[in-house]
């Protein structure tokens, strides 16, 4: 029976970027492995788009198009493609004047921002978010989108993490990056550096520690995760008081709650120690503080994981790469890792 086998949905991403390319390349490499036989895969996007990228990349993948979402007909090892236009009529998903149903196209423009591409990317994401939020799929892998393009349709769009939290009604989420030897959770995400200090609050730090601790226990099967927390200022506390006022109290409170958390540590040492196995994860105060070290160690293998959602969500840690789109140059290693993690997490959580 397939009823208990988790379903993993993969969004289209911006079809003019490398999203469809890395998705299909990753699936081509993973399809013979045992892991994909433990899940049911569902690609969200027009069949014509996937077929065109299949040809561009000289792959020989076979697709099974399905007009409507029906779990009973989904089989492990098969690449099912859901017709997203028909899905809009089947599901109670609202449309707007900027995004009416009739504008969902089957063609796209390579290597540039366009409203046509944005419509396809947004339609796929909305379907994926709906399926995951309703528990109809257990895992969601999101291919890269161009945020500026999606803002043509949704002025509130900041990024995948914020969008999925909004759609699923989740108040507490965190962005964690898995680089293999190094895992990093961010306290602040997509904000200018000058606005970061205002976000370094005790409650916010405690929330990220708690989400990371719970996730490591549940999905990585680490009984007592060891979590390190970075300082905001150079050398731990020079030129600022955020450490004494916000970070230290957050760490001490979580220690009282029996969480194995340590710090704050200077950012110029802690990532090295964590990558050597001393800690299971690092809580970084801002985007580039955490991602600089992580991408140095795992530039083409890192995976973006959203903590706190009622479903598993992963994504490759790169963008649309318009400059190489359509040239069959993109490497799929990060997308492979994202799909593998989503499969493993969904199997464990199912």
Name these PLM-found stretches.
Residues 1-160, 203-285, 289-297, 301-304, ...:
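Contiguous, glycine/small-aliphatic-enriched amphipathic segments in soluble metabolic enzymes
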Residues 152-174:
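Glycine/threonine-rich beta-strand-loop-alpha-helix active-site module
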Residues 163, 175, 184-186, 313:
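Conserved hydrophobic/aromatic beta-strand scaffold that supports enzyme active sites
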Residues 165, 173-176, 218-219, 283:
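A generic local secondary-structure boundary/capping motif
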Residues 172, 176, 347-350:
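Residue-level signal for secondary-structure boundary elements
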Residues 177-206:
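Ligand-binding beta-strand-loop-alpha-helix segment within the catalytic cores
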């Amino acid at each position: 029976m397939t009823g208990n086998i988790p379903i993993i949905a993969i969004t289209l991403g911006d079809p003019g970027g490398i999203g469809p390319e890395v998705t299909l390349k990753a699936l081509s490499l993973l399809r013979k492995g045992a892991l994909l036989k433990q899940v049911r895969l569902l690609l969200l996007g027009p069949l014509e788009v996937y077929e065109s990228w299949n040809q561009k990349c000289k792959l020989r993948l076979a697709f099974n198009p399905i007009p409507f979402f029906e779990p009973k007909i989904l089989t492990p090892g098969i690449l099912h493609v859901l017709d997203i236009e028909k899905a809009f009529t089947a599901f109670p998903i609202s449309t707007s004047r900027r995004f009416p149903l009739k504008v969902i196209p089957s063609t796209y423009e390579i290597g540039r921002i366009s409203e046509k591409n944005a419509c396809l990317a947004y339609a796929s994401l909305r379907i994926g978010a709906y399926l995951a939020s309703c528990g109809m799929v257990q895992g969601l892998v999101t291919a890269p989108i161009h945020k500026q393009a999606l803002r043509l349709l949704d002025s509130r769009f900041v990024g995948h993490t914020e969008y999925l939290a909004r759609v699923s009604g989740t108040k507490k989420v965190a962005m964690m990056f898995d680089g293999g030897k190094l895992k990093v959770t961010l306290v602040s995400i997509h904000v200018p550096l000058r606005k970061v200090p205002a976000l370094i609050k005790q409650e916010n730090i405690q929330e990220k520690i708690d989400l990371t601790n719970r996730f490591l226990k549940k999905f990585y099967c680490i009984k007592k995760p060891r979590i390190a927390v970075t300082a905001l200022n150079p050398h731990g506390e020079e030129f600022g008081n955020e450490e004494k006022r916000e970070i230290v109290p957050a760490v001490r409170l979580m220690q009282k709650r029996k969480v194995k958390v340590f710090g704050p540590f200077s950012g110029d040492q802690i990532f090295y120690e964590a990558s050597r196995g001393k800690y299971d994860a690092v809580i970084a105060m801002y985007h580039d503080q955490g991602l600089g070290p992580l991408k140095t160690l795992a530039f083409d293998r890192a995976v973006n994981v959203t903590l706190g959602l009622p479903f598993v969500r992963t994504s490759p840690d790169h963008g649309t790469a318009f400059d190489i789109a359509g040239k069959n140059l993109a490497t799929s290693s990060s997308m492979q890792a994202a799909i593998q993690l989503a499969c493993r997490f969904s199997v464990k959580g199912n």
